[in-house]
Amino acid sequence: KESVLLLLAAIDKKQVPQEDVSAFHVRQLRNFKDKAVVAKLNQVWGLTRETPEKKRAQIEGYKTLLTAERLQHADRVKGRALYEKTCAKCHRLFGSGGNIGPDLTGSNRTNMDYLLENMVDPSALIPKGYEMVVVALEDGRVLNGNVVRKTDQQLTLQTQTELMVLDRRQIEEMSQSNLSLMPEGQLDKLSEQEIADLIAYLSGHSQVKLPESLESK
């Protein structure tokens, strides 16, 4: 416990970069189930909470489906096509994709628990800088997104679809949400084979070519 608190204190003092402690490591630290450790994690790393039992059951179901043999015979090219439709707008992988969410290339993608936990329950771990805020504007609009930059005059908000620069005089109320900008249920609409293809692509060590249907776009 003491060594964990020393590590978190070093992150707090900027002696250790926050990004050096991945979501995988944070999940391991949460396993201490120590109130002091969890409180310090929430302070210096970001929002963390336990995964609900219903979602844990979903994760176990996917793990039963995604056997080593099934993944070995999955189609990673089709998996990339699914990734481009569902993930690439927000995440980068192998140098391709968006920058709204964390870059996936260096994450612990070969760990099935890590991969599924982040897809099934994205709000369990939200690193600093990726917390979602809810912004109510005087014209009645309510926006959700990540704060990219803020000054006394302006707030730059990255939503799921666009980067918006708001005049702070337009903002009536702003609050932090405990939900991730990444939507839940990413796997719910996919068939078992599509899930296997997507996971095989995400957990792979190298890039694969785009399907011809996407290369021309």
Please describe what each predicted stretch is.
Residues 3, 83, 87-90, 100, ...:
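Extended, hydrophobic alpha-helical segments in both membrane/secreted and soluble proteins
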